[in-house]
Structures are given as C-alpha cells and as structure tokens.
Amino acid sequence: MNKEIIEVFDNTYPDRDYTIEIINPEFTSVCPKTGLPDFGTITVNYVPDKSCIELKSLKYYFLEFRNAGIFYENITNRILDDLVEACQPRRMTVKTEWNARGGITETVTVSYSKSKE
C-alpha cells in the first residue's frame, strides 16, 4: 500500500480541538488465508493539529487494499500508522467493522494520542 498517496491540507483552526469523522462503508481487501474478498466499514475519527486529510487522496489510498492479502488487525494498524504519519493529528482512532464470514463478525479498534512535550 502506497502511503505516499495520502495528501493533507492546512488546518485553518489549529488552536481549536474539533473532531473529524470519516466513514468508508465500502472497504475491500482479500483474506490472506482463503483468497476470498473481505468487506468492511472503516471509520476514522481524529482531532487535527496543523493539517487535515484530503478525502480524494484517502479514497485512493483505501483502494490500494482492494487486492491485498492482509488480516483485519494488520489493516487497522497499518491505516492508523499511515494516517498518523501523514497528518500528525493530536488524536486519532481507526475502527474497522468486518462483514460476517462463516457467521462471525469482527471489529478492530486502535488509537493514537500525541504525547505532550
């Protein structure tokens, strides 16, 4: 997955804490064990610092996963790491909710918080 695709723009209100929620209800990847497609919803909540994520570039970043064989847990952590690196938010949470396979669903949530220096 090419994280260089992710673009950001300047936050006009860097002195204010506010939350941005981004939802992608059509995320797809491939199960690395079976080769079958996985479908899920990705929710990103973050409090920006100096920059915000540009949505068109994020869409193309998410499409990078479409043919990738990768486990749910790895997808969730990879997205968090890549988005934190791109926009350096104050706080961010990535939640992935996966459609049922064999009658079982899975939700993975991972968070980041910028340390006070």
UniProtKB/Swiss-Prot annotation:
Pathway: tRNA modification; tRNA-queuosine biosynthesis. The active site is at C31, D38. It is an enzyme of class 1 (oxidoreductase). Its EC number is 1.7.1.13. GO terms for molecular function: preQ1 synthase activity. GO terms for cellular component: cytoplasm. Pfam families: QueF. Catalyzes the NADPH-dependent reduction of 7-cyano-7-deazaguanine (preQ0) to 7-aminomethyl-7-deazaguanine (preQ1). PANTHER family: NADPH-DEPENDENT 7-CYANO-7-DEAZAGUANINE REDUCTASE (PTHR34354:SF1). Belongs to the GTP cyclohydrolase I family. QueF type 1 subfamily. This is NADPH-dependent 7-cyano-7-deazaguanine reductase.
